[in-house]
């Protein structure tokens, strides 16, 4: 499978800041070609690359100017290995987190999914979240978590993922968020899905059902969107002036949502 992805981010800067980009495909994915460029006021800046325990690759730089422009391109030829299960995964990803308030949603989870476990539970959560929420672009705030999403009954991909994660954790199923490139997604943008740890394997949980899971390409992995944002800045405020994402696959296939799959 050959997948090609691009991303461009244009920022307005108001002063010195540290920019942290999380747009590169995760470490370990077989790359045929890749480039990452950053310019500040038109001059090239060399970022530092940092890789975390799950293979998330961060590109960070200290900048001072009026504009910053980032361009990323990658060609992936092949698939990644099966996601590794870390020694602490079944602890870290059972805890409530900033956007996944599993403790608050425990009564809801217990009443809605009584008697279900394993892969049957994953399918039930996917169907339930898909039924309860409506995908509406721009309907949620950056501060919205799973509880507010359920009350609003609408959201975007990260909101669907946060609610799925919170419900699963409340049912003692470790769950986490993955930021991905998603060939077939419309409108095209960064996508977020949940992953659930069942029978010793991480399985994709995407209640939006907006893109084929087999083609998804991992970028970042974490507890929730706080760990996986495509851009973080520390210091002076920044303004997003432009964002464009593309993702295509050479062998596009329809998704059989009755079967479980893994991020590869």
What is each stretch, according to the model?
Residues 1-79:
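Intrinsically disordered, low-complexity N-terminal segments that are enriched in acidic
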Residues 13, 80, 84, 90-155, ...:
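Secondary-structure boundary elements
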Residues 21-23, 36-38, 72, 109, ...:
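Generic structural hydrophobic/aromatic packing signal, biased to beta-strands
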Residues 127, 159-237, 241:
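Hydrophobic/aromatic-rich core segments of domains that either
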